[in-house]
Amino acid sequence: MSNVNPVTEKSVSWHGLYILADRALLPTRIETEQGDFDVEPIRQFDYRSRLALIEALAAAFMTGNPEAEVPPIENKKKPTPMEKLVGAKSWTDLERKSIYFSIMVYPSTVRLESWARASDGTWSDEKETALDITIPLSAGVEGVADTILEHLRTRRDLPGVTFDFPQPKTAKGA
């Protein structure tokens, strides 16, 4: 969608969107001296609703990635907040139950990435993206949401889901 190279710009914020069969999770991503972490609060919403997706993305973009202390080391041995919400047995189980979007916001663009499936049902490695697109920031949160929804219509690899988004009625068959 854009030929702007986000590599030349420093990111403004980075967000992870987890699409599940029945909902989406958009955790708060904090910035620490040891890297970024997904933490609570976690927005849960119906991703099939364009308005709900736009509202969740807009709130995340406004919040950005707050600076925070590194989560306690003992948390590494515990399930992540996303695993708990989903009832996943492990991170691998969470990956098998979800489609993940990395959303990098830059001053002039937004880069969206989503990974294909590996043979074991988890997300493929970083070189095997099912989506890797740069959207001009001028497209707004609406453009980002629309790109996510368009991509989800092409995916057939989320357990328990058939993507059947509401379609406008036409004179034929209405």
Indicate where each model-derived feature is located:
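Negatively charged, low-complexity tracts enriched in Asp/Glu with abundant Ser/Thr
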Residues: 2-7, 47, 51, 55-100
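Serine/threonine-rich low-complexity intrinsically disordered regions
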Residues: 5, 32, 46, 65, ...
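Intrinsically disordered, low-complexity regulatory segments enriched in Ser/Thr/Pro
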Residues: 11-51, 106-146
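Ampiphathic alpha-helical segments that act as solvent-exposed interaction surfaces
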Residues: 44-66, 130-166
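Generic hydrophobic segment detector
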Residues: 58-73, 101, 107-120, 149-160
